[in-house]
């Protein structure tokens, strides 16, 4: 894939995508997508199931070589998937340092594991970890590489609601400290609004929405403007909020 034109090359930590397209047979999944993410910006990509969100992220991660268009990414990038893909026969600390060498690697691994709340799990085996703990290892494995760009593909999709809340708080704290550019793929509108500086919606292979999120932080669902933005985004995803309401009991109360 050719690089982006020199006039559009980003500074460190950013991403520039120009006219990216991808087809599978007759089906067009990405249709001329263009996007720039500056250093430090947290961008969330929404879309219906099968909209091409993960296909786009795989292209940016250089995991799909049949994409047309130009993609220029930061030299240091890291990817976190829904399945952290830990090596089962390596202890936690060795999963974090996988593929790295140097005198300070072990020290740095201990530091990042401490940052994600796993300072006492250095010698643990992956099979002993909960889903949330395994995903924390995935984040630590990304952090130790000191990435300028972090790509996350529905990383919390398989976690329970309480663990997701904790992971949201952790991810926001880590982003505030390290300030990489972030592209976070999800189908969860509430998650997008809670985390994003900017929200994109992929529809029919194109970006139908590109909106800055101006809500004050920290955000909760009662933050002024949250519900308005939620309704707007759900509409773009083809969801009527009325469809999400709980059915009423016979006496008229919600169940």
Give residue ranges: language-model regions.
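The feature captures the beta-strand-to-loop junction immediately N-terminal to the Walker
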Residues: 46-48
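Helix-to-loop junction immediately C-terminal to a conserved catalytic motif
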Residues: 61
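Hydrophobic anchor residue at the start of the ABC signature
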Residues: 139
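A short, proline-enriched helix->beta-strand linker immediately N-terminal to the Walker B motif
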Residues: 144-148
């Amino acid at each position: 894939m050719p690089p982006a034109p020199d006039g559009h090359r980003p500074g460190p930590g950013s991403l520039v995508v120009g006219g990216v397209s991808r087809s599978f047979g007759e089906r067009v999944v990405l249709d001329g997508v263009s996007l720039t993410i500056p250093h430090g910006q947290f961008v969330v990509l929404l879309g219906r199931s099968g909209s091409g969100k993960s296909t786009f992220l795989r292209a940016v991660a250089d995991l799909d070589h049949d994409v047309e268009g130009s993609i220029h990414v930061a030299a240091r990038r890291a990817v976190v998937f829904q399945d952290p893909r830990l090596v089962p026969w390596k202890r936690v600390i060795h999963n974090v340092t996988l593929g790295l060498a140097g005198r300070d690697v072990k020290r740095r691994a201990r530091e990042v594991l401490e940052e994600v709340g796993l300072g006492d799990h250095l010698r643990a085996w992956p099979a002993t970890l909960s889903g949330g703990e395994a995903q924390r290892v995935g984040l630590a494995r990304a952090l130790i590489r000191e990435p300028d760009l972090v790509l996350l593909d529905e990383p919390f999709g398989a976690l329970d609601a309480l663990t997701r809340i904790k992971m949201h708080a952790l991810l926001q704290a880590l982003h505030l400290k390290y300030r990489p550019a972030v592209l976070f793929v999800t189908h969860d509108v509430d998650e997008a609004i809670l985390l994003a500086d900017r929200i994109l919606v992929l529809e029919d292979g194109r970006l139908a929405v590109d909106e800055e999120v101006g809500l004050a932080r920290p955000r909760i669902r009662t933050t002024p403007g949250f519900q308005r933005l939620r309704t707007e985004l759900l509409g773009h995803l083809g969801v009527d909020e009325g469809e999400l309401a709980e059915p009423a009991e016979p006496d008229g109360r919600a169940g």
